[in-house]
From Swiss-Prot:
Residues annotated as catalytic: 251, 308, 405
Localization (cell): Secreted
One Pfam family recorded for the sequence: Trypsin
Name of the molecule in the record: Venom prothrombin activator hopsarin-D
Enzyme class, UniProt record, top EC level: hydrolase
Domain of life per record: Eukaryota
Organism field: Hoplocephalus stephensii
Glycosylation sites: 92, 254
Disulfide bonds, paired cysteine numbers: 57-62, 90-101, 95-110, 112-121, 129-140, 136-149, 151-164, 172-328, 236-252, 376-390, 401-429
């Protein structure tokens, strides 16, 4: 009887095992609904192993104390824990103007650079003229611990203390008929290769002319002046500074017996309609260094054309209009720290459109990028003094060649245009790695103001 009873019990057990398995073991997705995974107990040997963040907190859910045991450093633990709990709040880079982000639980903290504040460092504190020019439209200077704005001549400071309001219809630096941004922007010139390449020659030639520039619109460069010799020919350019003052290059002055000036023209082919303005006096900088010998001569002066600046005083005032407006004269600090740190400037003139061809009858205009001083000096066989700077392109197959010396290099800041350079000299035409060289106007602001104040 006993063997039969034992057999029955064994058969009953074997029959019940599949049923038990189907009732106890569930799929993981279903089990997770009501089963919460708990930390497994460490084995005897695991307790004495060094802490491992992957084992403690990635493979399993850990506590902050367990994370601290791994890092053994409170700051590192806090950094890890803030991300571990709810993700990295700094992943979207919420701090503006290069502020530093520190993650928190459900929040973040921005540490701002000097002159910035706000939750995201979004507010600029204009306590320095180096930060966005102190929010000034024109000139900025530091007074005690604050910035103070001022404006160019013929403008007044706005009630907000930052803006500059024109006091007349023909305030300096305003070109009412400016080229639209698409045409005038530097990237378009570069990509379409419409811009002229300003380069230098085998010998430093003062006769730099704009080659392959775009035709200027009437009123686009209203500060442009043209110097005419006794034969009625264009020989140099200039920049209108006031009703009786025109800025030009010193080396232009000894090229002719007499000088007349034309303003407000973009086409000088019709000599019978153009109006010649008479000159009263010409002031050449006393330190100007003319070339005394031809290039290649053993005594050739490699600092020729230093102090290449002159001012023409008119007999009768220039009449301003939409097409005749002076360029604004900057302060030295504004020119050096703001204007010449822009991407590019604007050059215009009636120069030759091709090497050794006649001068252009129509005004040409180009945009040229500033070139850093180190690159400028390395590119030249001649000395680039502190009174000079370079601008132009080093690879595009356009060039400036033979001509419009004395003409304006203008830099826009907002809607106002300031004189920053005078076309001075160059080394050849279309030579790779060469640039146009300009007289640096910021070096001569006191001299210019002194000459303009003379009666």
């Amino acid at each position: 009887m006993a063997p039969q009873l034992l057999l029955c019990l064994i058969l009953t057990f074997l029959w019940s095992v599949p049923e038990a398995e189907s009732n106890v073991f569930l799929k993981s997705k279903v089990a997770n609904r009501f089963l919460q995974r708990t930390k497994r107990s460490n084995s005897l040997f695991e307790e004495i192993r060094p802490g491992n963040i992957e084992r403690e907190c990635i493979e399993e859910k850990c506590s902050k104390e367990e994370a601290r045991e791994v890092f053994e450093d409170n700051e590192k633990t806090e950094t890890f824990w803030n991300v571990y709990v709810d993700g990295d709040q700094c992943s979207s880079n919420p701090c503006h103007y290069h502020g530093t982000c520190k993650d928190g639980i459900g929040s973040y903290t921005c540490t701002c650079l000097p002159n910035y504040e706000g939750k995201n460092c979004e507010k600029v504190l204009f306590k320095s003229c180096r930060a966005f020019n102190g929010n000034c439209w024109h000139f900025c200077k530091r007074v005690q611990s604050e910035t103070q704005c001022s404006c160019a001549e013929s403008y007044r400071l706005g009630v907000d203390g930052h803006s500059c309001v024109a006091e007349g219809d023909f305030s300096c630096g305003r070109n009412i008929k400016a080229r639209n941004k698409r045409e005038a922007s530097l990237p378009d010139f570069v990509q379409s290769q419409k811009a002229t390449l300003l380069k230098k020659s085998d010998n430093p030639s003062p006769d730099i002319r704009i080659v392959n520039g775009m035709d200027s619109k009437l009123g686009e460069c209203p500060w442009q002046a043209v110097l005419i010799n006794e034969k009625g020919e264009v020989f140099c350019g200039g920049t209108i500074l006031s009703p009786i003052h025109v800025l030009t290059a010193a080396h232009c002055i000894n090229q002719t017996k007499s000088v007349s000036v034309i303003v407000g023209e973009i086409d000088i082919s019709r000599k019978e309609t153009r109006r010649l303005l008479s000159v009263d006096k010409i002031y050449v900088h006393t330190k100007f260094v003319p070339p005394n010998y031809y290039y290649g001569h053993q005594n050739f002066d490699r600092v020729a054309y230093d102090y290449d600046i002159a001012i023409i005083r008119m007999k009768t005032p220039i009449q301003f209009s939409e097409n005749v407006v002076p360029a604004c004269l900057p302060t030295a600090d504004f020119a050096n720290e703001v204007l010449m740190k822009q991407d590019s400037g604007i050059v215009s003139g009636f120069g030759r459109i091709r090497f050794k061809e006649p001068t252009s009858n129509t005004l040409k205009v180009i945009t040229v990028p500033y070139v850093d001083r180190h690159t400028c000096m390395l590119s030249s066989d001649f000395r680039i003094t502190q009174n000079m700077f370079c601008a132009g392109y080093d690879t595009l197959p356009q060039d400036a060649c033979e001509g419009d010396s004395g003409g304006p290099h203008i830099t826009a800041y907002g809607d106002t245009h300031f004189i920053t350079g005078i076309v001075s000299w160059g080394e050849g035409c279309a030579r790779k790695g060469k640039y146009g060289v300009y007289t640096k106007v910021s070096r001569f602001i006191p001299w210019i103001k002194k000459i303009m104040s003379l009666k």
